[in-house]
Amino acid sequence: MWLCPLALTLTLMAASGAACEVKDICVGSPGIPGTPGSHGLPGRDGRDGVKGDPGPPGPMGPPGDMPCFPGNDGLPGAPGIPGECGEKGEPGERGPPGLPAHLDEELQATLHDFRHQILQTRGALSLQESILAIGGKVFSTNGQSATFDAIQEACARAGGHIAVPRSPEENEAIASFVKKYNTYAYVGLTEGPSPGDFRYSDGTPVNYTNWYPGEPAGRGTEQCVEMYTDGRWNDRNCLYNRLTICEF
């Protein structure tokens, strides 16, 4: 039975003109493809490829649980542009009541006394010779002699006026200068329109006198008053030079 395929094969070979020798391999035309075989086993992993480009940023993650420490203060910025004026505010609350008026008056009186004392001291020191304070007055002399009018001018320049006693204590204070310099001194009295009527420089009548017995005796010819070394008074011509004594 196997002789039939062999005879068929020989017949095909003879028809195609192919020579066949017993000792050589005959090459025929390709046969019909067979059915695909089953998949083989997976191969081994290949080598790492080249590093790719960075991908886009991912979405922001949730806040962390650990707080961060604040950083250092930055440099001060440049001054900003002045802003517009704001609206007028509401009136403030009423302040506490001020001091009573009488306290202010007392303060003014105290300041006036201080000012007066300063002027007294400044004027007395300007004479720079002898100073004596009696009550609210300061008597001072520069030790120089002059006429009545010249003494008035000198005392006025120093901020005072020619000394005039208005009490026994003040008379004794002026007399102490007269005794010290052993000379007479004018006091601030002048004769009025009537002979023997002596008054203060402001024109008011004299309320204290210490005349030497029999004085005043000039009867209108001696219109000033001088003090002796014992403190007694005598009317005298105003052109004589007498010790300069001022009061402040």
Curated annotation (Swiss-Prot):
Which one GO biological process term can you cite for this protein? respiratory gaseous exchange by respiratory system
**Any one cellular-component term (Gene Ontology):** extracellular space
Q: Signal peptide location in the record?
A: 1-20
Q: Which SUPFAM superfamilies match?
A: C-type lectin-like, Triple coiled coil domain of C-type lectins
Give the span(s) annotated as Disordered: 33-100
Q: Binding residues for Ca(2+), per the UniProt record?
A: E215, A217, N234, D235
Comp. bias regions, Pro residues: 54-65
Which GO MF term does the entry hold, naming one?
Answer: carbohydrate binding
Which cellular compartments is it found in? Secreted; Secreted, Extracellular space, Extracellular matrix; Secreted, Extracellular space, Surface film
Role this protein plays: In presence of calcium ions, it binds to surfactant phospholipids and contributes to lower the surface tension at the air-liquid interface in the alveoli of the mammalian lung and is essential for normal respiration. Enhances the expression of MYO18A/SP-R210 on alveolar macrophages.
In the record, the note on similarity to other proteins reads: Belongs to the SFTPA family.
What name has this protein been given in UniProt? Pulmonary surfactant-associated protein A
What is the protein's species of origin?
Macaca mulatta (Rhesus macaque)
The organism's taxonomy opens as: Eukaryota, Metazoa, Chordata, Craniata, Vertebrata
